[in-house]
Amino acid sequence: MSVRFSSASRRLGSVRLSSPGAALGAGNTCGVPGIGSGFSCAFGGSSLAGGLGMGGASCGAFTVNEHGLLSGNEKVTMQNLNDRLASYLENVQALEEANADLEQKIKDWYEKFGPGSCRGLDHDYSRYFPIIDDLRTQIISATAQNANIVLQNDNARLTADDFRMKYENELALHQSVDADINGLRRVLDELTLCRTDLEVQLETLSEELAYLKKNHEEEMQALQCAAGGNVNVEMNAAPGVDLTVLLNNMRAEYEALAEQNRRDAEAWFQEKSASLQQQISDDAGATTSARNELTEMKRTLQTLEIELQSLLAMKHSLECSLTETEGNYCTQLAQIQAQISALEEQLHQVRTETEGQKLEYEQLLNVKAHLEKEIETYCLLIGGDEGSCVKSKGQGGPGNQTKDSPKTAIVKTVVEELDPRGKVLSSRVHTLEEKSTKVNNKNEQRIPS
């Protein structure tokens, strides 16, 4: 008769019974992590063997017979079991001490380099301080020289711009004066033409007056010659016209007409000259005021452009300073971020190691508890088998004798359920009594659950 117990992480072996004695074999394989050691034991007529390895823990088999509790080999096996158990306990104690040492180191590290620590990284940078001060002094001196050169360059550029603006202003003023001179030349040409026209008219009138005077003299001479002759002509005619009076009247009329023309021409000339002089004066005043206003506006524009250039230079200098400051702070921020990342990496590594040590410690504690429970179970089994062995021995007597008296065997089977991490979930003990009357015949049975 045989039976096999199976579970997710355990295996129970077989139980063998024989007539001279009772043999009980049980195998229990537990999928729990171990520390790489093994154990085996034997009690009296029973033998117990087991092993604890990295892959799991296995509990061997034990045999009960009627020859007593401990034989020579069984004592050695028991001693081996005790030695291995002591070694296991020493290993557990060593691991606990190592874990405590590691926890103390972690605590010391947190006290020295933790977020609340005032020491920070325990590095001595005092030997670098003179070098840093020297480099800082050189950087400040180079920055000042660079700023001085930039300022000189800006001043030279502003001076060149100032001279360029002055040249442009003088050139514009020169062109304006040339334009005014050309305008005045055109006016002068017009006045010259008008004067020439008036002179031509004056000459024409003078010639006409001379011609009239000459005609008048000739007529007067002809009349005087005619009056001085001896010719007497008597005519009974109407009284004639007095030519002298007529000539005098004509002369007076022509003189009045010439005088009137002269006065009209002189008045027209004076009027035109006055209007032209007034226009020239007005244009000159307007030109002067416009020129003054243009000069003032150009001067204001030049001043504003100089201020704009200075403000642009100041803006550029401030932008350069801002860029340099931002670069320095970005570099410092990157260094601080790198230090923070390194510290976080160290902290993560320490936490990982701590969690690994904690997990290993919990596994060892679970293995320890499991082994202690197995040892207690084996002690219970050994206690029950001892009574069975004493009873069988009293009935059979010493030695291996063949009798037909009935034998009683008590078989205890421990069934344990384990989780994947090796922790015991439940434990059950099955007890079975069997009687056998056969002599020297070994019956191999597998006990049902």
From Swiss-Prot:
One GO BP:
epithelial cell differentiation
Gene Ontology cellular-component annotations: cytoplasm; cytoskeleton; intermediate filament
Spans annotated as Coil 1A:
74-109
Residue segments, region Tail: 386-449
Q: Which InterPro entries match?
A: IF_rod_dom, Keratin_I
Region (Coil 1B) residue spans: 132-223
List the keywords (alphabetical). Coiled coil, Cytoplasm, Intermediate filament, Keratin
User: In what residue span(s) does the IF rod domain sit?
Assistant: 74-389
* One MF term in the entry's GO annotations: structural molecule activity
Q: Where is this region: Linker 12?
A: 224-246
List the Gene3D superfamilies: 1.20.5.170, Single helix bin, Vasodilator-stimulated phosphoprotein
- The UniProt annotation puts the region (Linker 1) at 110-131
Q: Where is the composition biased (Basic and acidic residues)?
A: 430-449
| Annotated region (Head), positions in chain | 1-73
Q: What else is known?
A: There are two types of cytoskeletal and microfibrillar keratin: I (acidic; 40-55 kDa) and II (neutral to basic; 56-70 kDa).
Q: PANTHER family, from UniProt?
A: INTERMEDIATE FILAMENT, KERATIN, TYPE I CYTOSKELETAL 27
The task this protein performs is described as: Essential for the proper assembly of type I and type II keratin protein complexes and formation of keratin intermediate filaments in the inner root sheath (irs).
State what protein this is by name.
Keratin, type I cytoskeletal 27
Organismal lineage = Eukaryota, Metazoa, Chordata, Craniata, Vertebrata
- Designated gene of the protein: Krt27
